[in-house]
Amino acid sequence: MKDVQEIPDEEHEQVLSRVAAVDVAKASGMVCTRVPHASTPGRRVSTVWQVSATTNAILALADELAECDVERVVVESTSDYWRPFFYLLEARGLSVWLVNAHQVKNVPGRPKTDKLDAVWLAKLTERGMLRPSFVPPAEIRELRDYTRLRVDLTRERSRHAQRLEKLLEDALLKLSTVATDLMGVSGRAMIEALIAGERDPRMLADLARGRLRVKHAALIEALTGRFDDHHGELARMLLDCYDALTVQIEQLTARIDTLIGQLPAAQPPAGDDSGDGDGDGGAAAAEARLLPAVERLDEIPGIGPRGAQLLIAELGLDMTQFPTAGHLVSWSRLCPRTIQSGTKSRSGQTGRGNPYLKGLLGEAAAAAAKTDTFLGARYRRLVKRRGKLKALVAVARSILVIIWHLLADPTARYHDLGPDYHTSRIDTERKTRGHVRQLQALGYDVTLTVAA
């Protein structure tokens, strides 16, 4: 007897009558339209031509596609060259999909040209065999440009601090082994004094502030070296670059705060009548529940205010793009691919995903792992049998699931389940028997009494 399983088609898998596809390059794009033949039923006609990647040429293309009543335009995501085509065609009111170039490759063994690639992309489009990539709305894209630049400048500022540390090592100064923060108040004062010409280790050690004062003897030893004039000149350049980046980061933060405040206010989910009541009282209660998304995301262990801003910039506020938390996790590449062949199934790699989002979630997972919370306990449970890296990925996935629920429901708030959630609820009898056996093995006579 055959094991027959019926697999239903996806809702979007339907033949489209009029489609267009754009194979993008740096200076131009190869456009292909597929429409029904004017006189022969069932026959389709492909038209291929090249369009310059300039604004006026793309606007003219948008008008032409609109006149042809194109139902969907698919743009291949090649580097950043897709942006002019996607933005201008979208602004014209066309239905534009951005598709992953890795998922639309032609059949191996066939000739590869831009013209054939455009035709192949159009054929996939008309048969509904493509999945659109997530492209947030314009206001979120603007916010994302600021947050990503802030991340990049913060990393570059850290590199300048590392270069300064290497410079001090070249000058035989071991300041970073005593001071945990080289760019803190004490470390900065000592470096400025070195640049100004001070070479006496005792005078430099006297510049220590706060808890670093108790390490006076260690500072004298660490500040004994050969700091020359050329070291001072290079250190001055590095500090100036560091300060300039700090100013730019502060400007970006102020702009990001403004853009976050201009985002549309969250609305309670449909069917939420918990705020109903006597007129304005119910509305006031509902407004009090709808805290800003940044504040609600900040309640998650490991996610700070800047991290919450980056999450909104990368994911947006509309979670209808991701029907379930599993869809968001899959899109973020935080779940391993399942590879099944014959009777064997194994887990593949998670994939690259969004580097800014995955980087933030990795840092948040590492920070949450050190806390006495549910997420911290989850990490400690998994690290014993899975290792550190897999445990961190699992915690990052849990954080992303929490984020989806908070963004999908503006009235939701994060509530920590506590570090003892698993130990007090899962297999309690089995754990009790195990502890009793261990005590008996040590020679104890155990009598269990239920606590009142």
Features from the language model and the residues they span:
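A detector of single, family-specific signature residues
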Residues: M1-A452
